[in-house]
């Protein structure tokens, strides 16, 4: 958050940490629930219990809901990584540049990946780790949670259906609200999961969603699987960003250049081509993050992605 006063940063924080809004986070969780392998499903159901209907869907917004509890003030910075780039002309994520203090979503995913399978922790602590993973893997797909410009778009005033909002809120919930028009998160997620299973465009892309592909890397790193990424991390016992979440952050950040920051000043962003492109991006990202969350938990509890 360079060149932003402390007061402004604090005033913007509430908007900054609510990626996708409750509906989007629920949808990510419900998509993931549809692809869980047996052991992962058993852990999720047991860990979340009746309070969350034994499902990642209702648990998805939890990490935003607890922000009103000052005991969790420390978690605010873990919902995003401030990519110091220049959209729409240049987009990039650099771990050393953008997470230099070690307090960002990339290290948070690493930490809670370790904690969710730590048998020395209590059931409650493992459950909390699961809820954070549910939420942070969802957050990672929201392009403005991988962007520093104007406090992740919070300072950029825009319009949606004639109403004033900011770019971050528009991408969190404004466009989703218009798209769903009263439809539930569970129903929306069911549709997205069907697209992944149906043999259509999503199905043809899904295997690529859970790789750690980086065309600029050496062949050995480019071919690193999600399973290898997680197990190498767990064996090292070092809390550092994993390869796959870093590549997924770069993926989300790329939409800041191709879509998010392509708006025209003064135009209503919930109409026309901008809205159409945003809907395609949001649905794709929610589907991706749900599928990735399932793959992540499947590796941890079933030994492989099983997808």
Each PLM stretch: what is its role?
Residues 17-136, 143-268, 273, 278-307:
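N-terminal, motif-rich segments that launch catalysis or mediate targeting to/interaction with membranes
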């Amino acid at each position: 958050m360079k060149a932003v006063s402390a007061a402004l940063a604090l005033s913007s924080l509430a908007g900054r940490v609510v990626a996708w809004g409750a509906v989007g986070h629920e949808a990510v969780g419900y998509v993931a629930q549809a692809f869980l392998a047996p052991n992962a499903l058993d852990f999720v159901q047991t860990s979340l219990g009746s309070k969350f209907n034994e499902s990642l869907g209702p648990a998805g917004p939890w990490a935003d809901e607890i922000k009103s509890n000052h005991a969790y003030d420390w978690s605010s910075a873990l919902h995003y990584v401030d990519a110091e780039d220049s959209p729409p002309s240049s987009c990039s994520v650099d771990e050393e540049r953008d997470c230099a203090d070690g307090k960002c979503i990339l290290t948070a995913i690493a930490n809670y990946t370790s904690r969710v399978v730590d048998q020395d922790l209590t059931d409650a602590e493992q459950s909390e780790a699961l809820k954070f993973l549910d939420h942070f893997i969802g957050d990672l797909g929201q392009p403005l949670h991988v962007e520093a410009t104007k406090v992740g778009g919070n300072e950029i005033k825009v319009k949606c259906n004639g109403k004033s909002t900011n770019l971050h809120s528009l991408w969190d919930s404004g466009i989703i609200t218009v798209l769903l028009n009263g439809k539930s998160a569970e129903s929306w997620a069911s549709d997205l999961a069907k697209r992944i299973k149906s043999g259509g465009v999503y199905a043809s892309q899904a295997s690529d969603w859970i790789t750690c592909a980086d065309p600029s890397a050496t062949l050995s790193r480019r071919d690193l699987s999600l399973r290898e990424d997680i197990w190498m991390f767990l064996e090292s016992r070092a809390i550092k960003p994993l390869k796959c979440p870093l590549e997924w952050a770069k993926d989300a950040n790329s939409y800041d250049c191709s879509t998010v920051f392509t708006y025209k000043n003064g135009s209503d962003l919930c109409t026309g081509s901008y809205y159409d492109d945003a809907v395609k991006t949001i649905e794709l990202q929610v589907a991706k993050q749900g599928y990735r969350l399932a793959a992540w938990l499947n590796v941890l509890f079933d030994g492989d992605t099983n997808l």
